[in-house]
């Protein structure tokens, strides 16, 4: 069944929408997201998958996949570039905030939110880096060494989406019809759906190279250097510059092959609220993030601060003891409260007056290797602002920077002296109807050329023990480094 009908699509066109999502449903019980992703990679290497598991045991309603982006928006050191589906530069500019450029692209793609359709029916998929902050805070100098060379922003525009409905075992093929000539646009959408169906049923799977680590992981800071950095941060806390700062450490290794199998293992061993794989022009990313940066749905904003960490116990009894220890740790509770307040302040920048509130306060969130204290903050988006404004207000999250945020970012720039890039930024989507869902870019492996990186951080407060914070970075990175190491053996186990 095709929805909407042509006559219904014409009505949406009359309402001023530039695009209308057209959907076709089919059974998905003999198709898996991973097998389909392999077919999409055979068609076009620039593709993505977005998945979700709630409470480590319940799959989210939808899994989204896309391939062959129509446009690619990138920003590097203030230079904004728009490329078409063939990689040809069609526009390049500088001297403006990236959000202006992004809005300019999206203004021709406004679409309706149709009842009963998946939450994402087309839009931008990709990332905003941690360093995106510099475009909003003009006085902030982020001049750390850039050893990785990743974009500040990389957003691919997809007007075709494949959605798994994990509740109804349905596959939903979505193509967006342009309304400039709605009859012609509708027929093209039907043709796009036909081609997607053919690819799903009869397409060949890509021969994807397995990951092979050629070296062991090398840290940016060894234990001694990281501990010195913590002591310097504590000095700034004693001097009154900041209350808290998040200091990260990076692991780097040489590798051959793809992160595809690493993603397969991550989704199995570390099921998380945000699981994603995407392959762009200059970056390949596999991740399983526990934490929302900001979510905008029909004008309602949410952010979910996670702060306070313990490793998981080997037994249920040990796990509960570690939970009690965490909830009784004054240092961890103080850190969490600071970051809840920062989340409220961030949402307050873009929310209607009086609408910001803490919905859920201090509950334990468990993941494969660690547990965290989590809270939920919500607000109502101001009518004169949009989802991109929300990213601008919240990024980077306080849980990846510190408090006060701007001074903490200055200290991170000084002490780490290494551009964070995608780590600590935002990964997710902005859809054509104005909604947004982004997670914090943590628990990720990301690759450029023959180098793969894993980064993690620890929140530093006045009574932090440097060696403990170094160990916390290791604990947080372990789910990803284990997945990278063990994914080298998947093919042999499946033979």
Model-identified regions with their sequence ranges:
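Extended alpha-helical targeting/anchoring segments
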Residues: 1-495
